[in-house]
């Protein structure tokens, strides 16, 4: 007898009341997309549980993929049997024997959801525990802190038995909270912001500003690689690459140096907002952390935000750099982000940017340069690509040279 299914437990979705089914269906769709290569599996879902029937598929690679699906609180390999005491005892014994159990401790945690079943939880704990003790060597009982917690759940459709919980990433299913545009540079912060936005259920489309010849194709490939890492958590992601050279040059030549950074950020936000409208998103996500750099002071954010009424979401706003780096390492974007390729955020950087800019001044300076035609041209010439887990990486890119 082998584990024949994976039991998935929901997290925050259980608080959603009448809307819960919408979240559960979204999670089911996301799990199905993630596991599309495993053609024999079948997914069954209920209001409070989801099951993946393995049907002979190997569980190890499936478990690895489930660890990155937002909306999953935890999951376990499971066995299902009929609601008959002897069969439950034998199935529980088989589940324990498939684990390293020599010298370990265990307990039984029985739960009788089906109240028609003739044995209560305490009786089940005793009967199953005694059966396991009689038929194993080197296994002892510890009801307070066991090495193995054998969970037995008797439901109307059958009894489910699990022995080990694997933590999921938590959060909400990607797409359950709507869609937002992620302003994605080549740095450390914005990929982390994208990851955290997806954890809150947002589907994201990435927007990157590309300024050739000042930025190279390697910088562009670096951003593609970052998006590819994010597809581990959100599936396919659209990447919009905006040609930004003419806009940046116009700002650099016409706007005073100390205000050029603020004006550049305002232009970026205008373009992102236009793309948001075109692609029917409801918010913009940035990697800003309050006070980290000159453009991320509260005064700067206020002036930059003035160009739109669209909600700006800043998942990193209260984090320090060490916290952000820790997450970047966890999601495997850090080493890509620190590759030494210039992006549009690092070129034309003023020596002494204003940390407390005045809105009236930046509006006055921008009145001397007509940026709107350049912004519209950049939007019209934006390149859009769809990135998935199979897109070419930097290593494959290097083989072209």
Swiss-Prot record:
GO terms for biological process: thiamine biosynthetic process; thiamine diphosphate biosynthetic process; thiazole biosynthetic process; tRNA 4-thiouridine biosynthesis. One of its GO terms (cellular component) is cytosol. It is found in: Cytoplasm. Signal peptide: none annotated. Residues 60-165 form the THUMP domain. Its main location: cytoplasm. Its EC number is 2.8.1.4. InterPro entries: Rossmann-like_a/b/a_fold, ThiI_AANH, ThiI_fer, ThiI_N, THUMP_dom, THUMP_ThiI, tRNA_STrfase, tRNA_sulfurtransferase_ThiI. SUPFAM superfamilies: Adenine nucleotide alpha hydrolases-like, THUMP domain-like. Pathway: Cofactor biosynthesis; thiamine diphosphate biosynthesis. ATP binds at residues 183-184, 208-209, 265, 287, 296. GO terms for molecular function: ATP binding; CCA tRNA nucleotidyltransferase activity; tRNA binding; tRNA-uracil-4 sulfurtransferase activity. The keyword Transit peptide does not apply. Belongs to the ThiI family. This is Probable tRNA sulfurtransferase. It comes from Geobacillus sp. (strain WCH70).
């Amino acid at each position: 007898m082998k584990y024949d299914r994976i039991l998935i437990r929901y997290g925050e979705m259980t608080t959603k009341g009448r809307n819960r089914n919408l979240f559960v269906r979204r999670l089911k769709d996301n799990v199905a997309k993630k596991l599309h290569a495993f053609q024999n599996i079948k997914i069954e879902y209920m209001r409070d549980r989801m099951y993946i029937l393995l049907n002979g598929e190997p569980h190890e690679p499936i478990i690895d993929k489930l660890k990155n699906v937002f909306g999953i609180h935890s999951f376990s390999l499971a066995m299902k049997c009929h609601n008959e005491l002897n069969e439950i005892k034998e199935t529980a014994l088989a589940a324990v024997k498939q684990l390293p159990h020599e010298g370990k401790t265990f307990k039984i945690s029985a739960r009788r959801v089906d109240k028609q079943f003739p044995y209560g939880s305490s009786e089940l704990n005793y009967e199953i525990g005694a059966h396991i003790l009689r038929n194993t060597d080197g296994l002892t009982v510890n009801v307070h802190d066991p090495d193995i917690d054998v969970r037995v759940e008797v439901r109307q459709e059958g009894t489910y038995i699990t022995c080990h919980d694997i933590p999921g990433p938590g959060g909400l299913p990607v797409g359950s909270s709507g869609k937002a545009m992620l302003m994605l540079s080549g740095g450390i912060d914005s990929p982390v912001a994208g990851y955290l936005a997806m954890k809150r259920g947002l589907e994201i489309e990435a927007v990157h500003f590309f300024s050739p010849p000042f930025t190279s194709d390697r910088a562009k490939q670096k951003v593609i690689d970052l998006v590819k890492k994010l597809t581990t958590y959100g599936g396919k992601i659209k990447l919009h690459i905006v040609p930004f050279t003419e806009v940046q040059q116009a700002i650099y030549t016409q706007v005073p140096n100390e205000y050029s950074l603020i004006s550049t950020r305002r232009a970026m936000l205008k373009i992102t907002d236009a793309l948001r409208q075109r692609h029917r998103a409801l918010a913009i996500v940035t990697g800003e952390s309050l006070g980290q750099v000159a453009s991320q002071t509260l005064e700067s954010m206020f002036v930059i935000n003035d160009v739109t009424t669209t909600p700006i979401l800043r998942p990193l706003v209260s984090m320090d750099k060490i916290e952000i780096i820790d997450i970047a390492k966890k999601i495997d974007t850090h080493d890509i982000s620190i590759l030494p390729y210039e992006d549009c955020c690092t070129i034309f950087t003023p020596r002494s940017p204003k940390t407390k800019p005045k809105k009236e001044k930046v509006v006055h300076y921008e009145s001397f340069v007509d940026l709107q035609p350049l912004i519209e041209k950049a939007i019209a010439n934006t390149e859009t690509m769809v990135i998935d887990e199979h897109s070419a990486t930097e290593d494959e890119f290097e083989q072209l040279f």
